[in-house]
A protein has these predicted regions:
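A short SAM/SAH-binding and catalytic strip from SAM-dependent methyltransferases
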Residues: 87-98
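A SAM-dependent methyltransferase catalytic signature shared across enzymes that methylate proteins
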Residues: 150-169
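Feature marks short, surface-exposed loop/turn motifs that line or immediately flank catalytic pockets
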Residues: 60, 123-125, 171
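Conserved N-terminal segment of class I S-adenosyl-L-methionine
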Residues: 1-80, 87, 101-104, 133, ...
Length: 254
């Protein structure tokens, strides 16, 4: 799915509306981590004098009040308290477990006042996995190597204060250990091969399997049936969680 189609989807518009309601702050400086096409960075130019748009590859956003920067959330090249506000959405789920705490510490370090974090909520990252045809490695959907709930996010930003939590969308997207094994055996034919993210093991692009045996096809049918049965009795859960954090001053910590 191209980025324009993604932005225009009803679920994405609902998510964007929630995030906009949390970005109520105004000030001089703002940092958008994982800026991509600049969708949120452009919106924040109405509230901040300067918006820094950061991504792993330098964003190409043409706006007089947006400064595009190539950078890594695990090693932000900014001084402490550099920004009045920091936005970080669709980022933390991609960060390796070993670097996740450091990334969150960096976000908290560079903000002066507030942070908004947006991630998938309790995502079952066993569902819709992919199998790399190059190396045979199994990948999580959309390159999401982490799953989050309120407790985990709050613990990762333990030095910040929770101001507000919002939940967006509903789904029943879950699987089970048996379906997972069957899908893996069948080559994960229904995985997220349309994703931009490459294989987390070898770095090559992910391509769907070109051929499967009759046994693999049967395995995927059984896995699908088990998933549908499971999802029919599951309670819906939110798709996204958004949290507005504020920075606690040193005096308030005492």
């Amino acid at each position: 799915m191209d980025i324009l189609t993604y932005r225009q989807s009803p679920s994405e518009q609902e998510r964007s509306k929630s995030l906009a309601s949390l970005i109520s702050a105004q000030g001089d400086t703002c940092l958008d981590i994982g800026a991509r096409d600049g969708f949120f960075a452009m919106q924040m130019t109405d509230r901040f004098s300067t918006v820094t748009a950061l991504d792993l590859e330098k964003p190409k956003i043409l706006h007089p009040n947006i400064e595009c920067v190539k950078g890594d959330v695990t090693d932000l090249q900014f001084a402490d308290n550099s920004f009045d506000f920091v936005l970080c959405v669709e980022v933390l789920e991609h960060i390796k477990e070993s670097l996740l705490e450091n990334a969150c510490n960096e976000i908290a370090r560079v903000t002066r006042n507030a942070v908004v974090i947006g991630v998938p909520y309790r995502q079952d990252i066993r569902l819709a996995r992919t199998t790399c045809v190059t190396c045979g490695g199994i990948n999580p959907p959309w390159g999401h190597v982490n799953s989050f709930d309120e407790k985990r996010l709050i613990s990762l930003f333990k030095d910040l204060h929770v101001e507000r939590i919002e939940y967006v969308g509903t789904c029943k997207d879950v699987t089970n250990w048996l379906s997972t094994k069957l899908y893996d055996y069948s080559g994960n034919p229904f995985g997220t091969y349309a994703q931009e993210e490459s294989c987390i093991h070898c770095g090559y692009s992910l391509l769907p399997p070109t051929s499967r045996s009759i046994f693999q096809r049967i395995a995927s049918i059984i896995a699908n049936t088990l998933n549908h049965l499971q999802q029919s009795i599951m309670r819906p859960r939110p798709i996204w969680i958004h949290i507005l954090f504020t920075k606690v001053s040193e005096l308030e910590k005492i």
